[in-house]
Amino acid sequence: MGEVQREKVAVIIGPTAVGKTKLSIDLAKALNGEIISGDSMQIYRTMDIGTAKVTKAEMDGIPHYMIDIKNPEDSFSVAEFQERVRKHIREITERGKLPIIVGGTGLYIQSVLFDYQFTDDAGDVIYREQREKLALERGVEYVHEKLQEVDPESAERIHANNVRRVIRALEIFHTTGEKMSEQIEKQEKELLYDVSLIGLTMDREMLYDRINLRVDLMMEQGLLEEVEGLYNRGIRDCQSIQAIGYKEIYDYFENRASLEDAVSQLKTNSRRYAKRQLTWFRNKMDVTWFDVTDGEKTSEILRYIEGKLQVKSNNSK
């Protein structure tokens, strides 16, 4: 019997504001594709401006998935993302279309493409119960600070109020001596799909200028009012509000910063995030990079995907 044919998946990654959205839609049109968002924050309804969510007009008729599937007060795990996206890949493939994952949340995308297992093993029950007691007696922030000390990557990703996941990460470190993030990465990295992994990059100063401009545009489009709406709904201490673009403006509404300082901090945090994204993708994934400093490379990228995945575009003769 022949080898089972793996599903074909195109993946477009890159830092915030580099131009992934337009490229992905152009590619989807050319390759008969449908788009899956690989951004961990675009899943939240009513959080449109701050997450730079693709608009209906920009979609131009191309189906998009993993957008507006959760309320801002809901939590969302890497494991749930993995399960949902893999289901979308199957369904898109069954319709004879090409799944195109677009995004910037590296661990989430990696969890889909590779054979990662997320388990809730029995672990150390006594240790877990002790942490639960500490959370009750001394507060969730205290337990979260303990995680920050041993596994800052997980602490940044998991909100303090998500006590179960905070304690799970602490428990993994306690029982194995490894960070949760390291344990995930140590698993056998077998690609589950036939993947074309495209990365967009550009001159750093140009990228930072684009990020600053994007933040100014977000403010003009009504980011302040968008965040105020969440604030007035009483949404506090949720995973969604940890997103860049929201936590900074929350500081303004809670009188911890002036609006000018909040916007300045938003720009700084966005630039730092872009730098972290690039570092993460370069260190963790085998990406073919295209420099778009001098303009888009849609035709070149299209030819690359055609060759890598052995698919034909609508532009092919």
UniProtKB/Swiss-Prot annotation:
Chemical reaction(s) catalysed: adenosine(37) in tRNA + dimethylallyl diphosphate = N(6)-dimethylallyladenosine(37) in tRNA + diphosphate
InterPro entries noted in UniProt: Dimethylallyltransferase, IPT, P-loop_NTPase
Cofactors, names only: Mg(2+)
Binding site for substrate: T16, A17, V18, G19, K20, T21
EC number: 2.5.1.75
Keywords on record: ATP-binding, Magnesium, Nucleotide-binding, Transferase, tRNA processing
Residues flagged as site, Interaction with substrate tRNA: T105, R128
Any one GO molecular-function label of the UniProt entry: ATP binding
Keyword Protein biosynthesis: no
Pfam families xrefs: IPPT
Binding site for ATP: G14, P15, T16, A17, V18, G19, K20, T21
Biological processes per GO annotation: tRNA modification
Annotated region described as Interaction with substrate tRNA, given as residue ranges: 39-42
Domain of life: Bacteria
Family under the similarity heading: Belongs to the IPP transferase family.
Complex formation: Monomer.
NCBIfam families listed in its UniProt record: miaA
PANTHER family attached to this UniProt entry: TRNA DIMETHYLALLYLTRANSFERASE
Function summary: Catalyzes the transfer of a dimethylallyl group onto the adenine at position 37 in tRNAs that read codons beginning with uridine, leading to the formation of N6-(dimethylallyl)adenosine (i(6)A).
Protein name: tRNA dimethylallyltransferase
